[in-house]
Amino acid sequence: MSEMTLNAAEQPIDELVGWVKQHDFSLNLTTERLAFLIAIAVLSNERFDEELGEGELHDAFAIVTRLFDETGEASAFRANNAINEMVKQRLISRFVSEITDGASIYRLSPLAIGITDYYVRHREFSRLRLSIQLSMVADEMAKAIEAAQKGGTPGHWKKNVYGVLKYSVGEIFDQIDLNQRVMDEQQQSVKQQIADLLNKDWREAINNCEALLSETSSTLRELQDTLQAASDELQTQILDIQEIVYGDPELEFIEEALFGLQMKLDRITSWGQQAIDLWIGYDRHVHKFIRTAIDMDKNRAFSSRLRQSIKDYFDMPWYLTFADAERLSDLRDEALVLRDDEVTGQVPMEVEYEEFQQVNDELSERIGDMLKAHKEQGTPIDLSVVLRDYLAQHPYTHHFDLARIIVDQAVRLGYSESDYQAIQPDWKAINEFGAKVQANVIDRY
């Protein structure tokens, strides 16, 4: 979520609606008007001062109208109407300059820049752009860490740490998030291309579909590798600043900024793996469709073409590529035994030989009793308290296995309303060895 969205979310909806109504905000861009706005943006970028005269706007309108000949001729009257519409919708700003003898000059508004920037600059999402943005973030974070280590007055923290985190690092994170959304659109475009190919002639489309699928999969994996490599460094930098400001009430605003950056970093990182997982599912779906189409081919066109290719092999040689991977063996055991590492001290016999199912049943009964009490009395269940109390009764080497079982039982028997409101809980300690858990209280049966 961008900083602007966060600020807007803090205001009541009725107040925002009233503000929009009071200023009479509205947008109505037909395809021709959008093309005109993009033409203005392109011409503005070619100018040093990014200012255009009325004659230049008329020229841009004439260029657009030639491509939209069905809408009418490019008269000065229609051009002026289009310009006035843009001004009314706050897409361009009009100024009267005495230097130009009262002639008007025009500049794009921030709203128009946002619209045209999407269409002009964000049509491609490349690994190079992502790498540069991540490198810029790392440099800005390094500046913030250096300033934090020096310390100083509240003004120093506000300007050299908070300002860098919020207005530099945060905005670059927002740009990365925007670019990821562009990549989402590109995936949808590839899916549409594949659908069009399969609908026209699936036999001829197989090779093209495979190329589109492989290219997109490769791009996603490269982007994820780039994200993963950079996110580790960024995570370390965020933790370094958190360690410096921890426990200082005067620097609470720094912690809030870091929390916002942490959420953005988590979202950016998780997007890559999620996009890969979704694309793998789509890839399988397409291949399943092609296999089904081959099996249901009444005319046996595919098999006929294959036989003909074999027959003509010596005249037109070809290569056959096939995959013959070894089958993976499933070594999972449904009745896992708890780890039996050697520990200092005496381990109770009932725990040392306790099996997974026994522990599972005991925890299920314990959490079930808590949920029953919650149902009758409305008392929420703090999973961190449950973990801390239960793990304190067992050796340290068993803590990981036991914690996994407790969480598994908890999510089966109850859930938290906060999870559906996207509320991120705090980390809480669950043992004396530094282990922590992040979970909302269970308040729904």
UniProtKB/Swiss-Prot annotation:
Q: Which domain of life is it from?
A: Bacteria
Give the UniProt entry's GO cellular component terms. cytoplasm; nucleoid
List the residue ranges of the region (Leucine-zipper).
Answer: 213-241
Compartment(s) of residence: Cytoplasm, Nucleoid
> What CDD domains does the database record attribute to this sequence?
MukF_C, MukF_N
What biological-process GO terms show up in the record? cell division; chromosome condensation; chromosome segregation; DNA replication
Q: Name one Pfam family in it.
A: KicB
Please give the function described in this protein's UniProt entry.
Involved in chromosome condensation, segregation and cell cycle progression. May participate in facilitating chromosome segregation by condensation DNA from both sides of a centrally located replisome during cell division. Not required for mini-F plasmid partitioning. Probably acts via its interaction with MukB and MukE. Overexpression results in anucleate cells. It has a calcium binding activity.
Provide the assembly information. Answer: Interacts, and probably forms a ternary complex, with MukE and MukB via its C-terminal region. The complex formation is stimulated by calcium or magnesium. It is required for an interaction between MukE and MukB.
Q: What is this protein called?
A: Chromosome partition protein MukF
Which organism does this sequence originate in? Answer: Vibrio parahaemolyticus serotype O3:K6 (strain RIMD 2210633)
- Gene encoding this chain? mukF
